[in-house]
Regions:
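Bacterial N-terminal signal peptides that target proteins for export
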Residues: 1-8
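Hydrophobic alpha-helical targeting segments used for export or membrane insertion
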Residues: 9-16
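Sec/Tat signal peptide C-region and signal peptidase I cleavage site
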Residues: 16-22
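Bilobed "Venus flytrap"/periplasmic-binding protein-like clamshell domains
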Residues: 23-52, 130-194, 198
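Extracytoplasmic small-molecule ligand-binding "clamshell" domains
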Residues: 27-107
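Alpha-to-beta junction loops
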Residues: 71-81, 178-179, 194-203
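Contiguous mixed-secondary-structure segments that line small-molecule binding/active-site clefts
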Residues: 72, 82-175, 212, 226-333
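A ligand-binding cleft/hinge motif common to bilobed small-molecule-binding domains
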Residues: 83-93, 189-194, 199-225
Length: 334
């Protein structure tokens, strides 16, 4: 009988231990902390995850570099960070932010809905990391402190903020002859606002929280031509979560995409019309070619993932089969 009591006790201890280990910590990057939109969405996610057997604790922070390092060190079981920062954990999804690769927010939502399919489940896993959701943060636009900077040639010699961990931005700045000023996501807005840089790239979602109207002043403008899509990634250590968690998570995130599309559209619409500067229709093909050449160059250097570049080329040509690039094969990677 004693062995039976011992077995019961051991089973009880094991059950308590399993319960104690069940809580997962997700570290959330939100540039404005607990009052931000990302944190609000993650609170909804936290609630939904209970249905998939996870008991998530959220830790919000405003320093994305620290959050990414904590994730690597195992201090967080999951993270919510930008796609550019997430590229180190999964180059496939981390290449959604490739320059000119997703032409607008509508296409971004279509792509992200497609990626939530079980067909792409294997591509979501990279070593000990799994991407369990990709969300749009919006089109990134160039903001200039002087409307006269209205062509690529006029960007030469100007100071442009580049994220210090994104090689793609440094290379692009060099190609147009601009002076790259190393920055991070927490200070690039302030550098623009206080005149340390002349040009930044940012989504409409950053306009209000970072008070970018201060940097625009009376002479500046937002160039109404998306240069890339900013994305958010949810990434986990899958061994810390229940089996099958990743796919359930991706499907939940997919269901939130129309909501995100509406919110981001409103954020753009809320920016006063006076700040927008249109790009002449005749100039657009030139910009498209410039971004395409840069993208191919960056893919050759291994910065962007070939599988994703091919997929996005296919998506773009499905949207607009008459586009000149659809007759070319240099992004149809084998």
């Amino acid at each position: 009988m004693q062995w039976f009591k011992t077995l019961l006790l051991a089973t009880g201890i094991a059950a308590v231990s399993a319960g104690a280990q069940a809580k997962q910590t997700i570290c959330v990057f939100d540039i404005v902390g607990k009052s931000g939109d990302v944190y609000a969405l993650m609170k909804d996610y936290q609630l939904a995850a209970k249905n998939w057997g996870a008991d998530i604790e959220l830790k919000v922070g405003t320093n994305e570099a620290v959050i990414a390092e904590d994730f690597k060190a195992g201090k967080c079981d999951g993270v919510s960070i930008t796609g550019m920062r997430g590229r180190q954990f999964n180059p496939f999804t981390g290449s959604l932010d490739a320059i000119g690769a997703i032409t607008d927010l509508k296409l971004a939502v279509k792509v992200m809905q497609g990626l939530a399919s079980p067909t792409f489940a294997k591509a979501m896993v990279n070593g000990k990391y799994e991407v369990v959701g990709v969300i749009p943060v919006g089109d990134a636009y160039l903001l200039v402190n002087d409307r006269n900077i209205n062509t690529v040639a006029k960007a030469a010699g100007k100071k442009i903020a580049v994220l210090d961990y994104d090689e793609a931005q440094k290379i692009m700045a060099s190609q147009v002859g601009a002076q790259a000023v190393s920055s991070d996501i927490t200070n690039f807005g302030a550098k623009f606002n206080n005149g340390q840089v002349d040009i930044i790239g940012a989504p409409a979602a950053a306009f209000k929280p970072l008070e970018l109207y201060k940097g625009l002043g009376t002479k500046g403008a937002i160039v109404n031509y998306p240069i890339l899509q900013v994305t958010g990634n949810l990434i986990i250590h899958p061994d810390k979560f229940p089996t099958g968690f990743g796919q359930k998570s991706r499907e939940w995130v997919k269901a939130q995409l129309p909501r995100a599309f509406g919110i981001l559209g409103k954020m753009k619409a809320d920016i006063p019309q006076k700040y927008w500067m249109e790009v002449p229709a005749a100039d657009k093909p030139g910009y498209q070619k410039l971004m395409r050449e840069a993208r191919i160059n960056l893919t050759a250097k291994g910065i962007y993932d070939k599988r994703m570049m091919k997929l996005l080329w296919q998506f773009r040509c499905r949207e607009d089969a008459k586009n000149f690039e659809c007759g070319l094969q240099d992004e149809n990677y084998k």
